[in-house]
Amino acid sequence: MTEKLIEQLEARINDLECQVAFQEQTIEDLNSALSQQQLQITKMQDQMKYVVGKVKNMDSSNMEDPANEPPPPHY
């Protein structure tokens, strides 16, 4: 191989190594973001279960029939 070809191949290998390093960092960043989002989703799911449970357990006697309520003051 000629000296020029060797230099070109070395430059290409160097470029590929830089790209791989950048991609590895990007993958780590995306993995971290995904992990944080999964924790947030799990927390929100737990909160939704709590709220749904509270709504289901509400005493229905607290809710009166709208027909029994007096009309608003503007009538």
UniProtKB/Swiss-Prot annotation:
It holds the Pfam family SlyX. InterPro entries: SlyX (IPR007236). Residues 56-75 are annotated as: Disordered. Belongs to the SlyX family. HAMAP family: SlyX (MF_00715). This is Protein SlyX homolog. The gene is slyX.
